[in-house]
Amino acid sequence: MRILTKRKITEKAEVERKTFFDIVFEWEDIFSKQLNLPILARTEWEFGFDERCRKVYQKIKVPFYRLYSLIDRRGKNIFMFDCSTKRQDGIYNNSRYIPCLIDYFLSDEEYGKFLRAYSKNPLVLVSNRDVYEYLQKKGCPIPIEHFPLSLPDYYWNDEIYEKKYDLVMFARQNPLLVEYINMYENKHPDFKLVRRKYECGHYIYYLSATGETVSIGDSHEEYVKLVSQSKVAVYTTPGMDGTRTDANGWNQVTPHFLEEIAGQCHIIARYPDNADTQWYEISKICKCVESYDEFEQLMDKYRHEEVDLKLYKEYLQNHFTSKRVDMLRSIIEKYHLY
């Protein structure tokens, strides 16, 4: 097996996309090193060819993308992360490629599009346990395996972090939690809150009370540093309370949750009870707040209380990327993907 990466293509991408892909590239590097899997670069030419063929196919139903298989000399059993589940057939829908779906936000009506987009792949890995069980119940004819997302082992540090802020608002925000944060800030003038805005291609982190810039969060490293400086973090699954309008009700646990644990943050969260949140046992770390009063009580407590580092470390042992290396090795052996 080999790994196909998008890292060259994302070099010119906007900050938001680049920081999203950083952890994906870290997973790829770990899998490559631990399983001795060569990394192949996806080229801008093939990316452009795939995009153009898809656009043409929408107008005239001629699958020009099938021509790519005639010139593709990479061989078989090529693993690739698919950050967004495709709704349309393309150059990677053939027996050579094994996609791992990170985000699955298709509606039930789009199930047929999923089948067509991955019909020729010998195996599809699905990160969301809820989606995996949904596809099983649908009788999905494509071989699928559950392959959950993870956190590189080196993110954990036994050193106790010095906290500079009560709350840093990083990552995508849940509108209900934002409402609670605004209410809390108005009632507590001493609340040290860092907000985020996107200006001129950069994420600007600034103190809410003064407007003073504390960070230009253009890199994943700077993001991780900010997480480690926040006493409390708010977390939400994508489809909760309209956080992502395109989520179609899907709510999976994302790496942000694991990053907040590694950053030694207390976590106040909004999430549903589903197969994925149960698989991650998210309730061991945080409960789903149901009211502002509950939010306020937790924030008051967490601003003055240390986290349980022993609990956090033990929890992450099951979700480090080294554990996913073992899972991928088992999948390779099960399907003879050598």
Regions found by a protein language model. Name each.
Residues 290-293, 297-338:
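A charged, aromatic-enriched C-terminal amphipathic alpha-helix characteristic of glycosyltransferases
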Residues 282-289:
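A short acidic/histidine/glycine-rich donor-binding loop in glycosyltransferase catalytic cores
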Residues 100-102, 118-121:
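Pre-catalytic or accessory/regulatory segments outside the catalytic core
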Residues 102, 149, 290-291:
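Active-site donor-binding loop signature of nucleotide-sugar glycosyltransferases
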Residues 79-82, 90-106:
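Active-site proximal beta-strand in glycosyltransferases
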Residues 123-124, 287:
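A residue-level structural signature of the nucleotidyltransferase/glycosyltransferase Rossmann-like core
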Residues 2-68, 73, 81-90, 108-119, ...:
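Nucleotide-sugar donor-binding catalytic core of glycosyltransferases
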